[in-house]
């Protein structure tokens, strides 16, 4: 695919069919990492998606951040990025550090959703000098999923080839009315391209993660965005984040579930802009 940085065009960037064609690639240490870039004002925003998603996860948010430089990557093993040899939180964080250095980003604000929020915390702890701000959206320090949790049970039941119409997606991508069906279909197609064994391998790493110590060492200005109806990481998880991330501000998207940037992207964009452009 041609490597090209495009100017922001809100309506076009929210369109789904051509999303994969917008990806560029870097190859740090032999691992190919895909990303989508929209040019704009600095500091850049580095947007890190959740488990089984891709850079597409931020396609509804991007138009509301028009005028700002956006870097939206596919985590290793997701989308068009190579799987590499490990799926630990630190592995993902190291990849993002390599991307920041490759693009010579100056103190970007890193916005992480769900798994991406966990990765962003690890990044801020491991590479303090690289980032200028942190947004932890629908995140957690320690998922602590029981063996009968719907996510664990649902992933264990998946078999290749995974269908984009598998009933599991009705739960996994559940959100309030109004989220475009073309967007949700694109997410399901992206996720279904991942082998079931990779779903399970990544989820195992998520389940064993504990970012408490890492979060306690973060000194980056931090905004926590919590979905008021989040079925995965509810109020107890958000309070734990707030206690451990020194000086963090906790903001609730009251009517949203686990995906505030899909359900109310204007709210999320406004929160990010107000937090880091004040």
Regions found by a protein language model. Name each.
Residues 1-45, 66-68, 105-106, 193, ...:
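Alpha/beta-hydrolase fold catalytic core
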Residues 31-82:
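Conserved HGGG/HGGXW glycine-rich cap/lid loop of the alpha/beta-hydrolase fold
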Residues 121-126, 131-161:
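Flexible "cap/lid" loop of the alpha/beta hydrolase fold
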Residues 145-150, 161-217:
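Conserved alpha/beta-hydrolase catalytic His-Asp/Glu region
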């Amino acid at each position: 695919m041609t490597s090209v940085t495009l100017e922001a065009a809100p309506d076009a960037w929210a369109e789904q069919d051509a999303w994969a064609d917008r990806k560029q690639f870097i190859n740090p240490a032999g691992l190919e990492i895909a990303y989508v870039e929209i040019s704009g004002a600095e500091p850049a925003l580095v947007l890190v998606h959740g488990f089984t998603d891709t850079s597409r996860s931020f396609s509804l948010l991007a138009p509301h951040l028009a005028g700002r430089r956006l870097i939206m990557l596919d985590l290793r093993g997701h989308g068009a990025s190579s799987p590499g040899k490990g799926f630990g939180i630190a592995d993902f964080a190291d990849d993002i550090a390599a991307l920041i250095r490759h693009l010579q980003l100056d103190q970007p604000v890193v916005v992480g959703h769900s798994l991406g929020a966990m990765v962003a915390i690890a990044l801020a702890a491991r590479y303090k000098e690289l980032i200028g701000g942190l947004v932890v959206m629908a995140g957690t320090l320690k998922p602590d999923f029981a063996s009968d949790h719907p996510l664990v049970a649902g992933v264990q039941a998946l078999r290749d080839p995974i269908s984009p119409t598998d009933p599991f997606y009705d739960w996994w991508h559940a959100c309030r009315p109004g989220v475009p069906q073309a967007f949700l279909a694109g997410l399901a197609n992206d996720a279904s391209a991942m082998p079931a064994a990779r779903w399970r391998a990544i989820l195992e790493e998520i389940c064993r993660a504990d970012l408490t110590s890492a979060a306690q060492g973060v000194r980056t200005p931090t905004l926590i965005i919590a979905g008021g109806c989040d079925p995965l990481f509810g109020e107890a998880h958000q309070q734990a984040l707030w206690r451990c991330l020194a000086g963090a501000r906790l903001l609730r998207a009251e009517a949203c579930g686990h995906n505030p940037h899909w359900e109310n992207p204007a709210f999320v964009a406004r929160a990010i802009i107000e937090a880091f452009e004040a």
